[in-house]
From Swiss-Prot:
One of its GO terms (molecular function) is protein-folding chaperone binding. This is Co-chaperonin GroES. One of its GO terms (biological process) is chaperone cofactor-dependent protein refolding. The gene is groES. GO terms for cellular component: cytoplasm. InterPro entries: Chaperonin_GroES, Chaperonin_GroES_sf, Chaprnonin_Cpn10_CS, GroES-like_sf. Belongs to the GroES chaperonin family. NCBIfam families: PRK00364.1-2, PRK00364.1-5, PRK00364.2-2, PRK00364.2-4, PRK00364.2-5. Heptamer of 7 subunits arranged in a ring. Interacts with the chaperonin GroEL. Keywords: Chaperone, Cytoplasm. It comes from Cupriavidus necator (strain ATCC 17699 / DSM 428 / KCTC 22496 / NCIMB 10442 / H16 / Stanier 337) (Ralstonia eutropha).
Amino acid sequence: MNLRPLHDRVIVKRLDNETKTASGIVIPDNAAEKPDQGEVLAIGPGKKDDKGNNIALDVKVGDRVLFGKYAGQAVKVEGQELLVMREEDIMAVVNK
């Protein structure tokens, strides 16, 4: 991927939701909600403080994160739909 986010921006790839419920009902693609979890593919250098130093981000490449349903800006890169969002749009990191 040839995409380098700036400042406190993060590139996230949505993770697919389950297409079958616990009771075995299959959910068609057009009825499923957008996933609110994703994998961090790239991070920017961070925001700058008052002295011009970068403040490192709390997330890192490979983290599985939770975010709001409408967070980020959707972009298509090399045929993949990705989200560009600020770190503050990420609500949590999912521990494996």
